[in-house]
Amino acid sequence: MKVGLVDYSMGNMHSVSRAIQQANQQVCVVRSESELAQVHILVVPGVGHFDLAMKKLEQKGLRTGIAKWIAKGNPYIGICLGMHILFETSEEGKEEGLGVYKEQVKRLPVKVIPHMGWNRLECQNSECQNSEWVNWKAWPNAWAYFVHSYGVMASSQACATTTYEKIQMVAAIEKDNCFAMQFHPEKSGEFGLWLWREVMKKAASL
């Protein structure tokens, strides 16, 4: 089963590609809407500015292509900026996101930005325990690697949260065929590799 890794010049393609391969999946780089037909699972990484990301996707024809992909029920996995673009808007810019989630991405209301380094995932509430994508009970004390200045403070569809400077924020979120992470699983060691295998298994079943 081919995993499409979207290349829109906004992410660390090499480390994400290697992590997917370590999860025993074949990687196919996607740079245009027509190439979406060649893959079964879509992974969208990303680090950088929200507006620039949406504009680059538009230039490649992928903004509409990804929206259609999600609407058809195909599996989408987002990382960091790849999570942010799933929301309607961001305080970081004026472009519209894909609108899968209704909340707004906001600048973190903290003293030290970016939120960078290892942080514990909180997966104890009912949404986490009822996750259709990840069996969080199998890794109850997970730590993941974060690098971000913007995020989502709350969502009913969050399946994991984290707390930084006493501010709780979304660490992972899911809705039907979409699963996205604020943290970087490709930089999160053994837990990250385990998580890749979990989400790939779910994505392959869709």
From Swiss-Prot:
Coiled coil segments of this chain: none
Keywords: Amino-acid biosynthesis, Chloroplast, Glutamine amidotransferase, Histidine biosynthesis, Hydrolase, Lyase, Plastid
Catalytic reaction(s) noted: 5-[(5-phospho-1-deoxy-D-ribulos-1-ylimino)methylamino]-1-(5-phospho-beta-D-ribosyl)imidazole-4-carboxamide + L-glutamine = D-erythro-1-(imidazol-4-yl)glycerol 3-phosphate + 5-amino-1-(5-phospho-beta-D-ribosyl)imidazole-4-carboxamide + L-glutamate + H(+); L-glutamine + H2O = L-glutamate + NH4(+)
Cell location: Plastid, Chloroplast
Pfam families: GATase (PF00117)
Domain Glutamine amidotransferase type-1 span(s) in chain numbering: 2-206
GO biological process: L-histidine biosynthetic process
GO CC annotation terms, alphabetical: chloroplast
Pathway(s) the chain acts in: Amino-acid biosynthesis; L-histidine biosynthesis; L-histidine from 5-phospho-alpha-D-ribose 1-diphosphate: step 5/9
Gene Ontology MF terms in the entry: glutaminase activity; imidazoleglycerol-phosphate synthase activity; lyase activity
Active site: 80 (nucleophile), 184, 186
Role noted for this protein: IGPS catalyzes the conversion of PRFAR and glutamine to IGP, AICAR and glutamate. The HisH subunit catalyzes the hydrolysis of glutamine to glutamate and ammonia as part of the synthesis of IGP and AICAR. The resulting ammonia molecule is channeled to the active site of HisF.
NCBIfam families in the record: IMP_synth_hisH
PANTHER family tied to this protein: IMIDAZOLE GLYCEROL PHOSPHATE SYNTHASE SUBUNIT HISH
Summary of subunit composition and partner proteins: Heterodimer of hisH and hisF.
Protein name per the record: Imidazole glycerol phosphate synthase subunit hisH
Source organism per UniProt: Cyanidioschyzon merolae (strain NIES-3377 / 10D)
Lineage: Eukaryota, Rhodophyta, Bangiophyceae, Cyanidiales, Cyanidiaceae
